[in-house]
Amino acid sequence: AMPYAQIHYPFENKEIFDDRKVYPADFIAEGVDQTRGWFFTLHAIATMVFDSVSYKAVVSNGLVLDKNGNKMSKRLGNAVDPFATIEQYGSDPLRWYMITNASPWDNIKFDIDGIEEVRRKFFGTLYNTYSFFALYANVDGFDYSEPDVDWKERPEIDRWILSLLNSLVKDVDGFLDTYEPTRA
């Protein structure tokens, strides 16, 4: 069990564990079905053996259901092969689809057609934006190694865009720090 087995404690790496470099864990993540089993067992072991908690925070993932809201099952024939899905659509569109369609703690209705839509609408737009930039950057001989222009010397539109970017970074960091990746 994490974090004991992952570092082969107590047979090896005792100093890493005893120095609290890997223990307690900052957070753990697992399905909601593990609440009474794994989550409880980790704390019970930690309390009995080390008089401590084994993790500081927990993210309990919801279930991945089929597009009709039924539990996925090989027996029912509605399970999706994750490796084939990644091979066909790529891992980034799959990740983006999963993180933007439901909060991690909510159940998600998985529809493979949604990954294609994400790939086309989000990643296609991102790719086209980059292609547009790259085309004109190459034509104009753009070189990012040019020195940065001081904030006060930039045009107002540049300062406005940079202000929006800095606000976005602050918001995203805040959402990630509070375990709200869907809002990030």
Which stretches of residues belong to each language-model region?
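Structured secondary-structure scaffolds
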Residues: 1-139, 144-147, 154, 158-184
